[in-house]
Amino acid sequence: MASRQQVDKNAQFPEPNLSRALDLAMELMAIPGRSGQEGKVVDFITSTLRTAGVPSLAIRTDAAHKQIPGGGEVGNLVVTLAGTHEGPRRLLMAHMDTVPICVGAKPRRKGNRVISDDPQTGLGGDDRAGCAVVLNTLLEIVERKLPHPPLTFFWPVQEEVGLFGARFAPLKLLGKPKLAFNWDGGAAEKITIGATG
């Protein structure tokens, strides 16, 4: 476990690498991965994490796909980090699958927008943009050795066809988070607060 340190409430944090975040989104949108076929997305995220030095033991996939009606290539991807300081565990998540029309997407930049070079495909921004946000956040924390509470990064499968990845995720694997942040659609000014039970 990482040594615990006090968090300086006045600490200045570096600006995130937004250029890399956009590059990650572009790369992720180009990877085919409709519901049930997210294996290449898992491979990309896992490879990126290992290259950045995330310990292999912190990177896991579950067997949710074996419980999902119709199966699938792979289960959910989960990364857990011990905190550098005390605090409630936080979970950051974005689903990996896209709807079928996004398979074959060829994203390209046009000014300050991202469009598909193939008008017959969607971009897959839902939710590959969210995957890029969660991945870039993890990379920033690890590479810059930023202080953080215990964290769980969760990329579920098969959201588009019934929230199946999240539904069949073994909760123990997520580390009992007290707060969750889900990057999936909606206006930036909209925050949904919910509780189970």
Model-derived regions, located:
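Catalytic-core environment of secreted peptidases
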Residues: 77-125
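Acidic/histidine-rich catalytic neighborhood of metal-dependent amide-processing enzymes
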Residues: 119-197
